[in-house]
Amino acid sequence: MKNRNDRMLLYICMADAYAFAMEYLTGVNERFSRYACLKFKCYCNHPIHLHHLPASFYTDDTEMSVANARVLIEDGTSNLLPLIFADTWLHEFKRGGGRKGYSRGFQNLLEKARSGLNLLQMIRP
């Protein structure tokens, strides 16, 4: 690899945790939150989703990215089976404490699944 960065995933997690406070902000009353975040001085709480995640916690987006990275690093690219991804997604979800933030349907599946195979069986395309 020409420009290897062993901390890239860490930086992605940090950026996701930082930017979460600005997700979906559109109203005038949210300008203060947006302004505070854009100063880049500290992690901020989301003004609407206060129950969702405390400031500085990464989101479901990063959790899934970590799971996908684990699969690619551990299994390479020649044997990528859906079951490997499902097992790893479920493992990361449980390792992260079952964090909220996924779409309601997928959150429900992750909460109910007992295994990667069970998760795949419950998914309805």
Each model region followed by its residue ranges:
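Structured, active/binding-site neighborhoods that engage oxygen-rich ligands
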Residues: 1-125
